[in-house]
Each structure stands twice: as structure tokens, then as C-alpha cells.
UniProtKB/Swiss-Prot annotation:
Ranges where the record places region Disordered: 427-452
Function: Involved in protein export. Acts as a chaperone by maintaining the newly synthesized protein in an open conformation. Functions as a peptidyl-prolyl cis-trans isomerase.
Domain of life: Bacteria
Protein name, per record: Trigger factor
GO biological process: 'de novo' cotranslational protein folding; cell division; chaperone-mediated protein folding; protein transport; protein unfolding
PROSITE patterns, per the entry: FKBP_PPIASE
Annotated EC: 5.2.1.8
Major localization listed first in the record, in broad terms: cytoplasm
Organism: Lactobacillus helveticus (strain DPC 4571)
Length: 452
């Protein structure tokens, strides 16, 4: 295959390539088989025309467009690979020549990934993380579990924040009832934020049997557009007031909330270990995020093509909607429930698309520079893990994802680990002082440049 690559811009170029006569012949044969079943030629039954008769009657050129559509995708992919370019998006391909019994020549206008110049990605300074678990952390978790296991008991007297009231309510706007504005025997925890702002506050300080006229204004960004920004009156009847009775903090409580322990001390030790694990995981995530952010900041990346931004948005959208569907929610149902649409979701993902693409480009450059590879065993494990995560069989995963795609994900994670493992934790105050100094130096340099 003859392939020529000519760069016309930082992220654009022209790719000229040939499609061999042998490939064209296969494409013509396949195109003929597709059209032959619907052919009407005088003197022949429908679908029983030979290739020779077809060429005599219509000419071989009648198959060229279909044949080109058949052979072009593989020919273009092979040309991209041979040229050693990282093409993105859809190319614009035009024929240069399509002569009979000769190779065909094509010219493609191609968008390619921007050039990445790596800066320092080892030894990135990141804020030091505190993973110590304090007694107050354990106490707070115990309090939370007591709250979760509290018993609601009838309360005499006025309601307070944290109490649960059983109410009937009927809402009106300008004297007219509206859909979803009424309920009977509804249990509402005061201070939970379950209702629109102001509703729960107006029920505090009342007793069972009280009638309360609750007046609120729906938020301007309220999901139901016909209610947004409007004042509503809720005629509310309080039937019961209940307060939380917290369980006693003892061995019995410990066994009730966790059947793997026998004493309160054992529960405390278990909670402390769980909190330690959580803090260490959160610390590792924070270190990784800061280290990668530093590596990206130190790198220089040419302007990112729109095609890469759109590809990223498409990927994010498909992954998000795919997760929804795995939970049994189809896209249209999701849009209805959230009062959104596809365009709004795309706009949301587009906000950070450029940064995501830049980060991925820098990580890919690190993969290449460090010569990171994925072994067959790692690819096999990746398939097993994905099959378990998405409840799919391994064969389906293998048919859906190529080894190259899996290898890419594995090696990018290796690059992330490499950057993280080589990061240096420093005191936050020291790091902030250094960043402030760097910002000041940058500002001074810009001032000098302007005053020249």
C-alpha cells in the first residue's frame, strides 16, 4: 500500500493512500452479490443475472460506489496505521482516481491528536494527607448508628427539630389545588430537608391536634416548571408528634447493630478499622488526583481538536445512560424523571471535557515514554473483572472490547499509579506558600513582558 502523510496544521493533515486492485476486486464481487438479488434484466429471472451480463448491461462502474463503501473503512484504517498517526473523529475522504483495472487512490483530510510535551511527572509535590482516626470520629459513627436504630415514641408538647410529625396537608396556589400538593397521614422528620425550604420550619413548635397554615414559595429552579417561583399555602393538620429515643450504648446495642461482634469494645475497634480504611482510600484518591493534576499542569499540549471533545462527550453520555439502563431506567424515562434532555446532559459533560481529554493525552504520553505494557494475564483479568462488574459473560466482553482497548485502559492506570507512587507529600502550608511564590513570579514575568 502506498501511503503519504502531509501535515497541514498542528492537528490536521492530508493522508493519500492506494487501494489495491485485489481489494477492489473483492469489493466489486461483494457489491455485485448485494445488488444482484434485486436486478431486473430482460431475458433473465430476477436475481439470476451473471456478473458478465451485468457488466455488459450496466457497466462495472455501476458497482464502484458500493464497492468503495465496502473496502474504504479497512483501507483507511490500514493507511492510518502505516502512516503512524493518531487519527481522531471522522475523516473527509475524496477519490483522486478510480480507474478500471488499476489501484484506486484516495485523499483523506484527517484530524489527529495534538502533540504532547511532557514536563515533570515524577516527584510531584502534593498536600500531605492525615489518615489518623480520632476518638471523636468513632464517637460520631456510634452516634449515627444510634440515630439509625432509634425508636420513635409519642411526644407530649411542642415539636422540635429532629422530631417526626404525622400530618395531613392540602396545598393551593391562588386558591386552587395542584397536582401532588396533598397527602394524608404523611410522616415527616422536621429538619430532614425532605420538603421545600421553609415548610418543615413552620411545623416546629406545634402540638398534636394543631392546624397550621404553612406558606412557602417554590424555588425558581423547582423541577415542576408550573410551580417554580410561586407562593403556595398548605392547610396542615398535625395528628402526632414523635421524638427519637436513642438506644443505650452497651454490649447489647453492639450485637444488635453488628452480629459479628459481642461487645461494645469490639464494635468500636471494628469501626476504627473501617474508618482507617476509608481515610486511607480517600487519602490515596486525593494524592492521585493532585499528582496527576500536577503532571498535566507541567505538560504542554497543543490545542485540542473539537472532534476529541465531542468523542469524550459521547463516551461520557453513553457510559452514564448505560449505567442508568443497567438499573432498569431507559433514557426517555430518565429525562422525564429529571426534567432534562439529551442536549442538557451533553452540555453538562462538555464543561470538563477538554480537561479530561488533556489528562488522558498526558497519561498516554507517559505510557509511551515509560514503555508501559499490558500482559496477556492482565488483559484476561481485566475481562474477568468487567464481566463480574457488569454481570456479563466473558465471551461477550471479549467480543465487545478489543485487546487494544483493554490494553489502553490497563496501561493508563499503570501511568496513573506511576505518577502517584512517585509523588511527594508535603505540608499543605509549605505547598500553598510555594504555589503563591510561583504565581507571584509568573505575574512579575508577565509585567516585565508587557513593559518591554
Amino acid at each position: 500500500m502506498s501511503v503519504k502523510w502531509k501535515k497541514t496544521g498542528k492537528t490536521t493533515g492530508e493522508l493519500t493512500f492506494d487501494i489495491s486492485k485485489d481489494e477492489i476486486k473483492l469489493g466489486l464481487d461483494q457489491a455485485f452479490r448485494r445488488v444482484k438479488k434485486n436486478l431486473h434484466v430482460p431475458g433473465f429471472r430476477k436475481g439470476h443475472v451473471s456478473r458478465v451480463i451485468f457488466d455488459q448491461y450496466y457497466g462495472e462502474e455501476a458497482l464502484y460506489e458500493d464497492a468503495l463503501n465496502i473496502v474504504l473503512p479497512n483501507a483507511y484504517s490500514a493507511a492510518v496505521k502505516e502512516a503512524g498517526i493518531a487519527a481522531v473523529g471522522q475523516p473527509q475522504i475524496v477519490p483522486v482516481s478510480m480507474d478500471k483495472d488499476k489501484d484506486w487512490t484516495m485523499k483523506a483530510t484527517v484530524t489527529v491528536e495534538p502533540e504532547v510535551k511532557l514536563g515533570d511527572y515524577k516527584g510531584i509535590e502534593v498536600p500531605k494527607q492525615n489518615t489518623r482516626v480520632y476518638q471523636k470520629d468513632v464517637d460520631a459513627e456510634l452516634d449515627k448508628r444510634r440515630e439509625q436504630n432509634a425508636e420513635l415514641v409519642l411526644k407530649k408538647g411542642k415539636s422540635a427539630k429532629g422530631d417526626t410529625v404525622t400530618i395531613d396537608y392540602k396545598g393551593t396556589i391562588d386558591g386552587k389545588e395542584f397536582e401532588g400538593g396533598s397527602a394524608e397521614n404523611y410522616s415527616l422528620e422536621l429538619g430532614s430537608g425532605a420538603f421545600i425550604p421553609g415548610f418543615e420550619d413552620q411545623l416546629i413548635g406545634h402540638e398534636a391536634g394543631d392546624d397550621v397554615d404553612v406558606v412557602v414559595t417554590f424555588p425558581k429552579d423547582y423541577g415542576a416548571k408550573d410551580l417554580a417561583g410561586k407562593e403556595a399555602h398548605f392547610a396542615t393538620k398535625i395528628h402526632e408528634v414523635k421524638s427519637k429515643q436513642l438506644p443505650k450504648l452497651d454490649d447489647e446495642f453492639a450485637k444488635d447493630v453488628d452480629d459479628s461482634v459481642d461487645t461494645l469494645d469490639e464494635l468500636k475497634d471494628k469501626i476504627k478499622k473501617q474508618l482507617k480504611d476509608q481515610k486511607e482510600q480517600a487519602a490515596n484518591d486525593a494524592i492521585q488526583e493532585a499528582a496527576i493534576e500536577g503532571a498535566v499542569k507541567n505538560a504542554t499540549v497543543d490545542e485540542i481538536p473539537d472532534a476529541m471533545i465531542q468523542d469524550d462527550v459521547d463516551t461520557q453520555l453513553n457510559q452514564y445512560l448505560g449505567n442508568m439502563q443497567r438499573q432498569g431506567i431507559d433514557p426517555q424515562t430518565y429525562y422525564k424523571l429529571t426534567n432534562t434532555n439529551e442536549q442538557q446532559l451533553r452540555s453538562q459533560f462538555a464543561k470538563n471535557a477538554a480537561e479530561r481529554v488533556k489528562t488522558n493525552l498526558v497519561l498516554e504520553a507517559i505510557v509511551e515514554k515509560e514503555g508501559l505494557k499490558a500482559t496477556k494475564e492482565e488483559i484476561d483479568k481485566e475481562i474477568k473483572d468487567l464481566a463480574a462488574e457488569y454481570n456479563m459473560d466473558e465471551k461477550t466482553i471479549r467480543n465487545t472490547l478489543s485487546d487494544d482497548m483493554l490494553s489502553h485502559d490497563i496501561t493508563v492506570r499503570k501511568a496513573m499509579d506511576l505518577v502517584t507512587d512517585n509523588a511527594k507529600q508535603v505540608a499543605k502550608a509549605k505547598l500553598e506558600a510555594k504555589e503563591a511564590e510561583e504565581a507571584e513570579d509568573k505575574e512579575e514575568a508577565e509585567d516585565k513582558k508587557e513593559n518591554k
